């Protein structure tokens, strides 16, 4: 729109759009072809397509923090002390059912939470969680963290995208600006994942100074793991720990100009 009054005038523009999609039906064979395999050291972005979710969605584990204590510390407590331990908000790698109750074996011992990997090539690995390890939500409450616990974490598609701008004129002066924006999308911050991994020679984020170091530490940054072994990458699995809001407002350009009088130009 244009506004004019005396020597002043203003011109505004705005645009917006929404791209929404949902996968309602797809041949099972095609679905399997599109979905990448889950690996035991999965730090790669899973390409996954699921019905009733949008194409371009992010999938991974739900991150719930860091285990404060080792399993052995918890297991050595009496049953009453164990219940009090959990009621106080402390965490240890112990399997809980849907009601938050401790899952026990035939001997009455608490079941230890494990990271369990297996695939169609008959490869199988188990890892016993320890104090300082990342806590991933056990979706089906079986005490095993595996591919069945991978869930939808959000869409990379924005709910709204577009731009706006204006041109302001006063006498011979002009101010011109243009912005673009995106609202409601999720991004997977792989730069942050690498900077908090503590398994490479790359520079690390200041956040790793607050990592778990000893039993009882309360922090959101897991312990440092050795780069050797099958589970060196466990604490930086793809999860909502690294999923962030992708909303932004960006200034594309800002111009200030002055239209010199013709007489002045001729003198130059």
Language model segments and positions:
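Outer-membrane beta-barrel architecture
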Residues: 1, 13-15, 62, 165-167, ...
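Conserved small-residue
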Residues: 3-154
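Short coil turns and loop connectors of transmembrane beta-barrels in diderm outer membranes
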Residues: 4-8, 20, 171-172, 262-266
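Residues that define the transmembrane beta-barrel architecture of outer-membrane proteins
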Residues: 8, 158-162, 247-252
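Transmembrane beta-strands of outer-membrane beta-barrel proteins
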Residues: 10-12, 164, 170, 175-177, ...
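Transmembrane beta-strands of outer-membrane beta-barrel pores
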Residues: 16-22, 170-172, 181-185, 253, ...
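Extracytoplasmic gating/loop element in the C-terminal half of outer-membrane beta-barrel translocons
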Residues: 109-111, 124-133, 137, 182-268
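Outer-membrane beta-barrel domain signature
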Residues: 151-155, 242-245
């Amino acid at each position: 729109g244009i506004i004019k009054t005396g020597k002043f005038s203003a011109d505004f523009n705005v645009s917006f759009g929404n791209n929404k999609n949902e996968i309602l039906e797809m041949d099972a064979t095609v679905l399997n072809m599109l979905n990448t395999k889950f690996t035991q050291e999965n730090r790669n972005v899973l390409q996954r397509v699921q019905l009733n979710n949008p194409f371009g969605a992010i999938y991974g584990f739900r991150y719930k923090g860091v285990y404060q204590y080792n399993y052995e510390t918890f297991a050595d407590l009496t049953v009453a002390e164990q219940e009090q331990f959990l009621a106080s908000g402390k965490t240890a790698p112990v399997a809980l059912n849907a009601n938050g109750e401790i899952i026990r074996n035939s001997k009455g011992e608490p079941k230890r939470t494990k990271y369990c990997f297996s695939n169609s090539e008959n490869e199988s690995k188990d890892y016993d969680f320890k104090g300082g390890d990342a806590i991933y939500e056990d979706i089906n409450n079986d005490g095993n963290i595996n591919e069945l616990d991978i869930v939808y974490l959000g869409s990379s598609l924005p709910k709204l995208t577009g731009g706006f701008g204006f041109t302001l004129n006063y006498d011979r002066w002009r101010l011109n600006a243009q912005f673009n924006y995106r609202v409601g999308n999720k991004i997977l911050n792989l730069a942050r994942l690498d900077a908090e991994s503590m398994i490479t020679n790359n520079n690390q984020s200041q956040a790793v100074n607050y990592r778990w170091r000893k039993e009882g530490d309360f922090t959101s940054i897991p312990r440092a793991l050795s780069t050797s072994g099958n589970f060196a990458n466990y604490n930086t699995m793809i999860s909502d720990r690294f999923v962030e809001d992708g909303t932004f407002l960006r200034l594309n350009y800002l111009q200030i100009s002055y239209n010199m009088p013709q007489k002045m130009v001729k003198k130059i």
